[in-house]
Amino acid sequence: MQIKDKVFIVTGGASGLGEGTARMLAAEGGKVVIADMQVEKGETVAKDIGGAFVKCDVSNEADGQAVVAQATSMGKLMGLVNCAGIAPAEKTVGKNGPHKLDVYTKTIMVNLVGSFNMIRLAADAMCKNEPEGTGERGVMISTASVAAYDGQIGQAAYAASKGGIVGMTLPIARDLSRNGIRNMTIAPGIFGTPMLMGMPQEVQDALAAMVPFPSRLGKPEDYAKLVKHIIENDMLNGEVIRLDGAIRMAPK
């Protein structure tokens, strides 16, 4: 699939991995819809790249439908990149008692249910596409994490949500294969996202030193490059790719 003139939805596109992806898609000639809860940032990025912005809680059905409607109004919706997510840290039993159930539930709702909500709605629209010459009608790319495999202390909720994304990658790809729609997942390691970049420099340096090679924090551009390759390589389907510089996380 070629990116030029196709429409892509990027959830969490107002910052971090999502913003890097949105900018790459626009630079390659794609039409981009940014779906995010950060209105001011989202509108700024959308204006900057000539795209559209829709305020969206990815776990909300009506919000997701509004995003897909905006995308299909702009042309042929051929791609969804799920980057929206939250990462609260809380132990199963901490100093103040057991893990708050509402925090656990919200993490699952945003990261896992939100990703599936956007996949199912975008896929429904893509099924109506006239197929490309290869028979392809679209591609889904979701964001898991190395925490799905190497969850650290305090990451029970986050690791569960990302593990769920890993677990549904293949069955969704199989579900959608008859429609010519691919489904892939990227599991990033330690990346220089806004949340991490807010930490003290010495903490950032220590985290970067944990990465075998290259010994640095991942950049949104690194993630966007892999998204581009997945879009363009139609043999990539039903798989999770770790993008982590060979890191394996310690317990804490």
How would you describe each model-predicted region?
Residues 76, 86-105, 124, 128-134, ...:
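Conserved mid-core segment of classical short-chain dehydrogenase/reductases
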Residues 78, 86, 97-119, 140-141, ...:
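Catalytic Tyr-X3-Lys loop
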Residues 124, 173-175:
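Alpha-helical segment proximal to the catalytic Tyr-Lys
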Residues 150, 228, 232-252:
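Short C-terminal tail/terminal secondary-structure segment
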